[in-house]
């Protein structure tokens, strides 16, 4: 061959074109696509053009390979001898095709701008501008994977250096068959490149050649790699599958166990520990279809197949699965060989194309999925990608995850290539979690010992790695986006996938997502996918929408911040007392309740290692004092007997956590980010709450060395300068340093009452134990946490109510469209807010347009009347005939005192229910009641009630806004189960009696009137007189059969009502204890005195059959039945009243044990609800 083949002529790289199914190069004038592929330099994607430099006898190629002839190749201008590299004329004269080293001839890989290559010294963008500052321009980059050549006189494209045997039949006849054939697609003939530090993120340098990077081969490859290469029938080499020899490039002094794995032992850089498979016996298609070759990094499949990508989202072509198996190159592995990860076999869609899909269709799909792109930088190319991303995952046998993998992945997350594809990455605060990047959560959580390389250890290391890129990892690797089914766990997606994800809205992740949270402690069932991580809680069966998630987070976020602040105080005190790092332990069967004070346990507590004895933080401090006395030699010891009759000394208690501190810190950080993202109003002043959660050495908590000023929060109108104006108008110039700090920080003012309440805090500076959540001027004391929350809520609502009363003037608080004493809407519910003081009447049980209106009234602590429930109630299940056969407890209720059980049976009660003449004779001042919980025998009634409940988001047991659905599994919910109440009617002349005395419920209450007896004719006249004498605000439906009268007071008036009852009621009868049965009924005369003397008025609601009354927790209320009625009551836990419910639970000394145990888990329910809300909002647009 005397003339140079056309495919070896010196044609400029940017002028070369490619066929339709080949590689499409970057055309001049076209805009390049930024971003490097974070993976192998695949054949199916565009790559920078390279020029070849022929090999020499002393090149890095081993002597066992044949080398090409001396064909004159033009040398680029200014190439010269640099750093010991020879020119093109040092080639030998040998026949056959040539093996080449890839040499950089295009500045885009280093410098980034999209322009044709300039034949001259290149000036990188990072250099000072002098040519000498770029000593590596035109440096040969040893990338043995690519070869510029041409087959069948077609346009050039990229093929492997070692071609399969079936390509030899397609060569031109004038070409000799004299190059080595690769019997396996994994053959790699080069030495292992060493990854220099210049490829790390943030380095300003480039890849400088090191003589140790590419070491010449000492022996022929066939001899050194006896387990890899040998003679092949169709060529010079073949694969020997019986043994694996040591790596060719093993450095001197290194052993096989001590050195790193071969970074690039295969064509695309896969580990050499995976079984190797030969090429397919027949060609998969046309030669030019090699442009669609792809190997999935997640599957460890080393066969190169043709076809469309696995998912439409991934722009790189993917391998189809032949009928025979997952990958065409996967042959049955020998016994004892470690198998591939087979992640591609577990993908939902699989990896196969349809059986009837032709090769042309697959090629078209592959070409559509592979848009042309252009690499702009060589930084972190195949040298880094092969060594970092294509390692075997932690679940592979005998392979553990490298500790530096997480750090490298974190570096890649902030690279400009990734940021350009998916938008600017959020700025990582300086030392958001100091120490977490070095040691994770090992100082905060003891991990069980597992075997090296086990899946549990790898998963645990992945969980403890902390937040990446400012985001909390809410899903495990198996729940990651399904764009790349071969994606390895913990490996960053390729930029093409990331860019496609940003440009195209992919909804497949939402259909398969399960909100996997690393903070979970119990299976959170969402979209029917059980997801558990730490065990210990339950959740609704379906994921919540964005609106409900925002409502949850706005109502519970502040409370969680207060809980986290108490957590930090508890950990700090424990570490000062010499307690070691807290152990993470959660037993679902053990209640989270203190054994001494019976308060709920949020997270950190002390427990006995032998029994279920647990102490909260406050009781643990007492135990800590006893521990100090033991150290000093005192004989006094505080011990508590447990089930095993063993004493609990302070030294025997172990500091324990249900959730690790690192997980709580991550949740707090992401919650504040979601707040800012969706402009959710909050009163949390912790700013970046996770900065002080840094775990130090040995579990010691480290305080930040520098106090970073808090990020400014926007006010209600988005103007951050509004608070500054208020600050300047304050004439007080003698502020304390704490005041000054509070004044400099922006003050959120979502409503006028909160602004006034926050300003009024300065009036309480002289009181050390008064602290407001709106504008704290001193750090909160640990002993007053239980009264702070209720004071905040009461003061804010009182200020708002007083402003409304002042605006309305003297008289009743009734707006337009409301009659005196009766809040009667003139039209159905409107979308806008009603006038101040008006009650809400929902005429539909499940309103489509009044849900936000209900939330606004419910947030203000107002009762709500709902009509239309009779449409779904089955009256045959709730009539006297159906309920007469059931049992129940008959009680006697008086005006002064709680209900008392009687000796009457239920049969006698039901006999006089409809016939007053058949009623048993009772005292003039008493009325009969019947109480029965709906249990297993009432399955049909319970189902009908569940389908008829209004506002199921709140009232249903599995409602998304019912915190009871987030309580831990295994916890008894008897206090929240429906209860059946039946009562005789009260005559009109006995208005001092009621069917339910004045009481305060710890949780929210819904009462549905399912049945009422027909009213007697004389009652209509008495009803008219009764309605005309109603006091306060009322709500009723004209023309309806009014059966019960409700009087509901505001929750903030409970203390004044309690003091009033102590004045007017006999000793012991005027108690208003939360959760206890009422002991007094306020008739019209007492209600008038209460209104005139104490300024406390009430709402009056008239309830008819088929209507429901919703009463918020903490609101005192009483009921009077005008006729014999049957009602069903059920409790629920709404986010708006969760803080008040927890306070009332602590105040209720006579709560039954099951009630106390339930309400003690409120903090746990808040934690679970915030987790679900944060996970939903973080993924929302």
Curated annotation (Swiss-Prot):
Substrates-to-products reaction catalysed: N(6),N(6)-dimethyl-L-lysyl(9)-[histone H3] + 2 2-oxoglutarate + 2 O2 = L-lysyl(9)-[histone H3] + 2 formaldehyde + 2 succinate + 2 CO2
Subcellular location as annotated: Nucleus
Record field: compositional bias (Pro residues): 311-323
An MF annotation (GO) of this entry: zinc ion binding
Motif LXXLL motif 2: where in chain: 752-756
Biased composition (Basic and acidic residues): 462-472, 721-730
SMART domains, sorted: JmjC (SM00558)
Pfam families cross-referenced by the UniProt entry: JmjC
Name of the protein: Lysine-specific demethylase hairless
């Amino acid at each position: 061959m005397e003339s140079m083949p056309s495919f070896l002529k010196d044609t400029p790289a940017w002028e070369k074109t490619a066929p339709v199914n080949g590689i499409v190069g970057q055309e001049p004038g076209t805009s390049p696509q930024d971003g490097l592929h974070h993976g192998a330099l695949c054949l199916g994607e565009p790559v920078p053009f390279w020029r070849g430099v022929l090999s020499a006898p002393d090149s890095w190629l081993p002597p066992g390979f044949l080398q090409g002839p001396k064909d004159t190749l033009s040398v680029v201008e200014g190439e010269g001898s640099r750093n010991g590299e020879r020119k093109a004329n040092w080639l030998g004269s040998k026949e056959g095709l040539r093996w080449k080293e890839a040499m950089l001839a295009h500045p885009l890989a280093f410098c980034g701008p999209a322009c044709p290559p300039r034949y001259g010294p290149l000036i990188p963008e990072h250099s000072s501008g002098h040519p000498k500052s770029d000593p590596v321009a035109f440096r040969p980059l040893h990338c043995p994977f690519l070869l510029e050549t041409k087959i069948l006189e077609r346009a050039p494209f990229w093929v492997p250096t070692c071609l399969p045997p079936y390509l030899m039949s397609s060569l031109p006849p004038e070409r000799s068959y004299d190059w080595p054939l690769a019997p396996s697609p994994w053959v790699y003939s080069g030495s292992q490149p060493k990854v220099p530090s210049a490829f790390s993120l943030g380095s300003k340098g480039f890849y400088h050649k090191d003589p140790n990077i590419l070491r010449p081969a000492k022996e022929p490859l066939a001899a050194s790699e006896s387990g890899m290469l040998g003679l092949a029938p169709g060529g010079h080499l073949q694969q020997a599958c019986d043994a694996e020899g040591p790596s060719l490039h093993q450095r001197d002094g290194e052993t096989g166990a001590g050195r790193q794995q071969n970074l690039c032992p295969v064509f695309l850089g896969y580990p050499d520990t995976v079984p190797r498979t030969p090429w397919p016996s027949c060609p998969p298609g046309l030669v030019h279809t090699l442009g669609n070759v792809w190997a999935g990094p997640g599957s460890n499949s080393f066969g190169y197949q043709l076809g469309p990508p696995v998912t439409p989202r991934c722009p790189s072509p993917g391998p189809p699965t032949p009928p025979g198996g997952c990958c065409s190159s996967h042959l049955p592995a020998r016994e004892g060989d470690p198998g591939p990860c087979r992640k591609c076999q577990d993908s939902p869609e699989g990896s196969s194309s349809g059986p009837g899909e032709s090769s042309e269709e697959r090629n078209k799909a592959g070409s559509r999925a592979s848009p042309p792109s252009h690499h702009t930088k060589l930084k972190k190319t195949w040298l880094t990608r092969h060594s970092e991303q294509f390692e075997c995952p932690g679940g592979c046998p005998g392979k553990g995850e490298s500790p530096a993998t997480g750090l490298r992945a974190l570096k890649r997350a902030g690279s400009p290539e990734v940021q350009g594809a998916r938008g600017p990455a959020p700025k990582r605060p300086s030392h958001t979690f100091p120490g977490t990047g070095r040691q994770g959560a090992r100082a905060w959580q003891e991990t069980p010992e597992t075997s090296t390389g086990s899946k549990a250890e790898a998963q645990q290391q992945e969980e403890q790695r902390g937040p990446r890129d400012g985001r909390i990892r809410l899903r495990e690797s198996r729940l990651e986006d399904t764009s790349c089914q071969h994606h390895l766990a913990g490996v960053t997606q390729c930029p093409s996938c990331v860019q496609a994800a940003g440009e195209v809205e992919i909804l497949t992740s939402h259909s398969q997502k399960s909100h996997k949270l690393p903070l979970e402690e119990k299976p959170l069932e969402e979209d029917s996918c059980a997801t558990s991580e730490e065990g210990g809680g339950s959740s609704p069966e379906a994921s919540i929408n964005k609106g409900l998630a925002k409502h949850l987070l706005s109502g519970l976020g502040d409370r969680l911040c207060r809980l986290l602040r108490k957590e930090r105080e508890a950990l700090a005190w424990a570490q000062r007392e010499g307690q070691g790092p807290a152990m993470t332990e959660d037993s679902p069967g053990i209640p989270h309740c203190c054994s001494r004070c019976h308060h709920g346990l949020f997270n950190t507590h002390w427990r006995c290692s032998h029994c279920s004895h647990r102490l909260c933080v406050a009781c643990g401090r007492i135990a800590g004092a006893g521990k100090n006395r033991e150290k000093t030699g005192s004989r006094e010891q505080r011990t508590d007997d447990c089930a095993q009759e063993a004493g609990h000394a302070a030294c025997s208690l172990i500091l324990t956590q249900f959730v690790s501190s690192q997980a709580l810190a991550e949740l707090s950080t992401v919650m504040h980010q979601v707040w800012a993202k969706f402009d959710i109003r909050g009163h949390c002043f912790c700013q970046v709450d996770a900065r002080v959660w840094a775990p130090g050495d040995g579990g010691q908590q480290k305080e930040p060395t520098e106090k970073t000023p808090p990020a400014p929060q926007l006010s209600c109108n988005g103007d951050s300068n509004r608070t500054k104006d208020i600050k300047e108008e304050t004439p007080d110039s003698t502020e304390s340093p704490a005041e000054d700090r509070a004044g400099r920080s922006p003050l959120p003012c979502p409503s006028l009452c909160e602004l006034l309440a926050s300003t009024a805090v300065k009036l309480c500076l002289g009181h050390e134990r008064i602290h407001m959540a709106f504008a704290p001027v001193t750090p909160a004391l640990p002993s007053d946490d239980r009264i702070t929350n209720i004071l905040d809520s009461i003061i804010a609502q009182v200020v708002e109510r007083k402003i409304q009363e002042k605006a309305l003037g003297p008289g009743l608080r009734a707006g337009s469209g409301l009659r005196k004493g009766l809040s009667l809407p003139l039209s159905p519910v409107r979308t806008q807010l009603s006038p101040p003081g008006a009650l809400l009447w929902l005429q539909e049980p499940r309103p489509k347009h009044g849900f936000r209106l209900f939330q606004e009234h419910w947030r203000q602590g107002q009762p709500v009347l709902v009509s239309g429930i009779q449409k779904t109630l089955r009256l045959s299940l709730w009539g006297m005939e159906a309920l007469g056969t059931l049992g129940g407890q008959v009680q006697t209720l008086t005006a002064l005192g709680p209900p008392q059980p009687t000796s009457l049976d239920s049969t006698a009660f039901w006999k006089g229910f409809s016939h007053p003449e058949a009623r048993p004779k009772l005292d003039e001042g008493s009325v009969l009641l019947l109480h029965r919980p709906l249990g297993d025998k009432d399955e049909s009634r319970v189902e009908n009630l569940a389908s008829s409940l209004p506002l199921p988001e709140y009232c249903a047991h599995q409602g998304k806004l019912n915190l009871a659905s987030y309580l831990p599994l295994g916890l008894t919910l008897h206090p929240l189960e429906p209860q059946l109440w039946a009562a005789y009617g009260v005559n009109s002349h006995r208005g001092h009696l009621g069917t339910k005395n004045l009481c305060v419920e710890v949780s929210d209450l819904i009462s549905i009137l399912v049945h009422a007896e027909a009213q007697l004719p004389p009652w209509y006249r008495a009803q008219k007189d009764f309605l005309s004498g109603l006091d306060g605000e009322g709500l009723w439906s004209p023309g309806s059969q009014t059966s019960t009268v409700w009087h509901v007071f505001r929750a903030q008036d409970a203390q004044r009502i309690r003091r009033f009852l102590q004045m007017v009621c006999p000793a012991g009868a005027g108690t208003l204890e939360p959760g206890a049965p009422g002991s007094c009924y306020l008739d019209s005369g007492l209600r008038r005195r209460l209104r005139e003397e104490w300024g406390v008025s009430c709402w009056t609601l008239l309830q008819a059959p088929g209507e429901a009354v919703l009463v918020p927790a903490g609101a005192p209320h009483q009921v009077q039945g005008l006729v014999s009625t049957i009602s069903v009551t059920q409790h629920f836990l709404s986010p708006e009243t969760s803080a008040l419910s927890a306070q009332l639970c602590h105040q209720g000394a006579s709560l039954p044990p099951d009630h106390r145990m339930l309400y003690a888990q409120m903090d746990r329910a808040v934690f679970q609800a915030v987790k679900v809300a944060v996970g939903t909002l973080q993924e929302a647009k």
